[in-house]
């Protein structure tokens, strides 16, 4: 069974997590939430929390697909350095990686997108290009594949990308 790991920097957008989660949950996948928070919970916007996840420091299982989400704080670039190291390592080990909308910022901050093509939400393209000049920004696509790393331009295109992953499997 393929292991799908969903992760990101809180608070993330509900639909950024729920859309791909719903797609993946319809398939024969083992789905896990890995959190940058020690208790394994993750804040999502609107004051809600998702519980039942695993602290990234305790997660050491193989990952087939790593899915990275973001939210309103993602462009700030203020992330736990240990989490970013973990994310970069897992990105290099996973068969494939997906980032939806502002999750591209989180993946870029880890260094996993250096020298790669990527896309993010159109409102944030200039900010991504300025903050991460070693990422080749593609402004005209809804999603971009560079080797085993895929990025999508928005929340609903993240659902499209999740459907593409299912089709590939």
Task: Report each predicted region and the residues it spans.
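Conserved anion/nucleotide-ligand pocket segment
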Residues: 141-169
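Extended, subdomain-level signal for the structured scaffold at the beginning of enzyme domains
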Residues: 1-97, 105-109, 139, 167
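Short active-site oxyanion
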Residues: 92-97, 112-117, 148
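Small/polar loops that bind or transfer phosphate-bearing groups
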Residues: 8, 120, 153
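Short, surface-exposed amphipathic charged segments that create phosphate/polyanion-binding patches used
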Residues: 46-50, 133, 152-153
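A conserved active-site-flanking secondary-structure segment within enzyme catalytic domains
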Residues: 113-142
């Amino acid at each position: 069974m393929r292991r799908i790991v969903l992760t990101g920097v809180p608070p993330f957008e509900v639909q950024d997590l729920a859309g791909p989660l719903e797609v993946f949950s319809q398939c024969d996948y083992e789905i896990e939430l890995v959190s940058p928070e020690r208790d394994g919970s993750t804040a999502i916007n609107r004051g809600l929390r998702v519980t039942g996840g695993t602290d990234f420091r305790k997660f050491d299982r193989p990952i087939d697909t790593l899915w990275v989400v973001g939210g309103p704080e993602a462009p700030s670039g203020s992330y736990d350095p240990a989490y970013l190291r973990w994310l970069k390592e897992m990105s290099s080990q996973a068969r494939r990686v997906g980032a939806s909308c502002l999750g591209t910022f989180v993946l870029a901050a880890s260094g996993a997108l250096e020298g790669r093509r990527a896309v993010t939400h159109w409102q944030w393209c200039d900010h991504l290009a300025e903050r991460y000049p070693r990422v080749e920004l593609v402004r005209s696509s809804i999603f971009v594949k560079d080797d085993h790393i895929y990025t999508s331009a928005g929340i609903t295109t993240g659902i499209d990308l999740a459907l593409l992953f299912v089709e590939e499997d």
